[in-house]
Amino acid sequence: MTKKEQALIEQYAKSLVEVASEHHSLDALQADVLAILETFVTTNLDQSLSSQAVPHAEKIKLLTLLKGNNSVYMNNFLNLILQNEREAYLYQMLQAVLNEIAIVSNQYDVTVTSSLPLTEEQKSRVRAVVAKKFAVTAGRLIEKVDPSLIGGFIISVNNKVIDTSIRRQLQAFKMNLK
């Protein structure tokens, strides 16, 4: 992706988030974006929208189906995307919208990787650690299980990481022995 395309994507995302923020509709916008992104993942819609082989009329039909129960701001955004024929960038724009919402609301997704699934008590402790160490509000808690960690956990928030895994400790110990 070129810098020009990236700037375009970011500008669309910022504009949508600004409008939703002015009207105190960030939560509704975030729900809409997450639902549409889920549709992209389950249907490979991104390939259809970015394909030159799919006629513009078909792309219009596909995006019209996405307009269902969305907020007015999301539907207007989708109309704007269609008018300007930017459907190929929609998936990246929606990802950028989530990033902008996180920045504006200081609420970031938290990814926790552990060797075993977390209990509810552990999840609440993770949220407390995130609030204290990173000075952000925890958004969605995305849990991943990786038995190769052996024990401990890895918390990732806004490109910052806390790694207390036994795997990392063993790697550090191995490096110290060299």
UniProtKB/Swiss-Prot annotation:
Q: Which domain of life is it from?
A: Bacteria
Q: Which InterPro entries match?
A: ATP_synth_OSCP/delta_N_sf (IPR026015), ATPase_OSCP/dsu (IPR000711)
Q: Can the keyword Transport be found in this entry's annotation?
A: yes
Q: What is its main location?
A: membrane
List localization entries.
Cell membrane
Identify the Pfam families for this entry. OSCP
Which range is the signal sequence, renumbered to this chain? none
An example Gene Ontology cellular component term from the record? proton-transporting ATP synthase complex
Q: Name one GO molecular function term.
A: proton-transporting ATP synthase activity, rotational mechanism
The family assignment reads: Belongs to the ATPase delta chain family.
What interactions and quaternary structure are annotated? F-type ATPases have 2 components, F(1) - the catalytic core - and F(0) - the membrane proton channel. F(1) has five subunits: alpha(3), beta(3), gamma(1), delta(1), epsilon(1). F(0) has three main subunits: a(1), b(2) and c(10-14). The alpha and beta chains form an alternating ring which encloses part of the gamma chain. F(1) is attached to F(0) by a central stalk formed by the gamma and epsilon chains, while a peripheral stalk is formed by the delta and b chains.
Supply the PANTHER family for this chain. Answer: ATP SYNTHASE DELTA CHAIN (PTHR11910)
Under what name is this protein listed? Answer: ATP synthase subunit delta
